[in-house]
């Protein structure tokens, strides 16, 4: 009986650990996939989540991201892209600043709900 309890406890810990991740994973993957389809393969930029800085605002309503440029580039990041959620779909926003600052929604002045750099979640200040 004691062994069964230990086994079940270990299995529960394994299941809970395997279910980790962000509640925004699907949304982030969706907008990066949309951008990749739009951009196509005609780019030197590695368009993958593991090569991006991603910020999620207002409970997932807005997603902002940029990709790290190749080492031989004069810039560190591409221009920032913004997507807004309408219903259950995200659409690319226009007329937003490429440097990620002073956008018309004031997102640059807010703390994101979620942020990751190169696929790793960052600690956000409250």
Curated annotation (Swiss-Prot):
Annotated spans, Disordered: 93-126
InterPro entries, per the entry: DUF4467
UniProt-listed Pfam families: DUF4467 (PF14729)
Record key words, sorted: Signal
Signal sequence region: 1-27
The keyword Signal appears for this protein: yes
Domain of life: Bacteria
Compositionally biased region (Basic and acidic residues): 101-126
Protein's recorded name: Uncharacterized protein YddJ
